[in-house]
Amino acid sequence: MTTEYDVIVIGGGHAGCEAAAAAARCGARTLLLTHRRDTIGAMSCNPAIGGIGKGHLVREIDALDGLMARAADRAGIHFKLLNRSKGPAVHGPRAQADRSLYRRAIQDLLAETANLDIAEGAAGDLIVDDAGQAAGVVCEDGRQFRAGAVVLTAGTFLRGVIHIGHDSHPAGRVGEPPAHALGERLQALGLPMGRLKTGTPARLDRTSIDWDSLAEDRGDAVPEPFSRLTQAIDNPQLSCRITATTPRTHALIREHLHLSAVYGGAIAGRGPRYCPSIEDKVVRFAERDSHQIFLEPEALPGNAGGDLVYPNGISTSLPADIQEQLIHSIPGLERCRIVRPGYAVEYDYVDPRALAPTLELTALPRLFLAGQINGTTGYEEAGAQGLLAGLNAARRAGGGEGIAIDRGAAYLGVMIDDLATQGVSEPYRMFTSRAEYRLSLRADNADLRLTGQGIGWGCVGSARAHLFTAERDAIDTAMQRAGAESFLPDALQQAGITVSADGRRRTLLDVLATAATPDAIARIAPWFAALPSRVSRHVETEARYSGYLVRQAREIRQLEAETRITLPADLDYRRIGGLSSEMQERLAAARPASFSAAQRVPGITPSALMALLSHVRQVA
């Protein structure tokens, strides 16, 4: 087997798969090094892709010809567009996936990728050349592979430890050993490191659940694919069911809280704020006597894992016997059998402030990091980072300039900027609220924002490039025609569109920004009604958002200018609309005396600053 490559990617999780595929698409001879081939693309925690903010990242991965969206479409068994009742900027495409089908889809897509080799092995050391740059990897069995750039996507494996109650053992995932030697090596290199934790709930036996007693949660009647390349969703679609914890559940948790790995002192690393364990929920929200649980099928019946159910909402590290009591206190699960108990896993991460915006370590050139090693949580966050790291590793190995994606261009850019400039104190999860440009960073326009650039970067294949060019041209033509075609009030009123009889002509874009019905639009512009739905939806959304986009740009300019505003010493950040609980806590702890000082509080996002500025103006 070849031992010389342009790029080596360590780790076959979501970040590693995207990194390896991206580097190979760019023409780099790439090696994906993983513990086991059969676990490539495994969904370690929840069997779902996408969500609010996360779905945007999946669409951005797809726009740059990544794998995740296509794999989710091939494996999806329950599609739902979250926030459908709200504006398109915060729509969150999400899909439950059959774990076995998703893993197979990722492996098939990698097998179809030119310039890519896959090898089994555990990375134990990095090769660092005389210039202090990463030059390859040494496996624990002594094999060496050299490369012009290395991408490390270790997930939860760096000195990982699994905890169930007070029992713990080294592991990166259930049944898989941790990367202990590699963690030691990174620490010896002087990288700024810390510990974080995440967790997962018990897996339940599908046949032991009282399904008929539980409310049904159906997916969308017409599933909307993640990928622009997907023509149709072929899998049968399944429903989820909804239940909830009870006061008895909470009493059990409080009674045995000292046995939890987190609250019993066994774990030092912080867990994800926005995906808390059930112990965290009971402690942090003591006034509540119930928390919702979604019972999500892990696979289609008859497929591997088809007898398992994922109870979304009750991640835990309590002892296995207490978990059983907890499960039996929940409606519909009174006789449920636990197939595998939930657990917490603690692992090493590298402070992402040590990274350049390209995801290259500034202290160790040619080594790129992506995924949970950078302090993030979630498949989508990992996959997006992996794609950028693989793209930049290929360019670095080939002598090209690195690419940094601006936060005004993509949620990926928002995430990287947040990580590299602010660091993390807990696992970072993407939300639409983190983006100050979210009106223009929609899930439905990811390709229009990024695919053209991806073509120039060399990471987009010909099939996607041709589709993108045709759709972009159709949208541009429709936008121009809708902006040029105008109507007098009489014509609009005759079509059933309510406007002021002021004699002023209105363009079709003006009309689309109103509450005019599709039938009324069809009467005045039959050509528009005949457009492909993707084209007409985009034009309509742009028309409706045009005023907001102008205001957004103005607010951003004001944000940059108004740094001298003073803040009251007794300002109650909990009363400021638009601030997440995380932002409230950070500002309340820092108590900045001025708006300028607020901008320097670690972890404060631009969107939080705009909410603060708006509040101060209102009360002034």
Swiss-Prot record:
A biological process term (GO) from this entry: tRNA wobble uridine modification
Keyword Ion transport on entry: no
Residues reported in the UniProt entry to bind FAD: 11-16
Primary location group: cytoplasm
Gene3D superfamilies listed in its UniProt record: FAD/NAD(P)-binding domain, GidA associated domain, C-terminal subdomain
GO molecular function: flavin adenine dinucleotide binding
Entry-linked Pfam families: GIDA (PF01134), GIDA_C_1st (PF21680), SAM_GIDA_C (PF13932)
Matches recorded under InterPro entries: FAD/NAD-bd_sf (IPR036188), GIDA_C_N (IPR049312), MnmG (IPR004416), MnmG-rel (IPR002218), MnmG-rel_CS (IPR020595), MnmG_C (IPR026904), MnmG_C_subdom (IPR047001), MnmG_C_subdom_sf (IPR044920)
Co-factor(s): FAD
One GO CC term, this protein: cytosol
Keywords, sorted A to Z: Cytoplasm, FAD, Flavoprotein, NAD, tRNA processing
Keyword match Cytoplasm: yes
Compartment(s) of residence: Cytoplasm
SMART domains in the record: GIDA_assoc_3
Similarity section: Belongs to the MnmG family.
Stated role: NAD-binding protein involved in the addition of a carboxymethylaminomethyl (cmnm) group at the wobble position (U34) of certain tRNAs, forming tRNA-cmnm(5)s(2)U34.
Subunit architecture: Homodimer. Heterotetramer of two MnmE and two MnmG subunits.
Record's protein name: tRNA uridine 5-carboxymethylaminomethyl modification enzyme MnmG
Organism name: Gluconacetobacter diazotrophicus (strain ATCC 49037 / DSM 5601 / CCUG 37298 / CIP 103539 / LMG 7603 / PAl5)
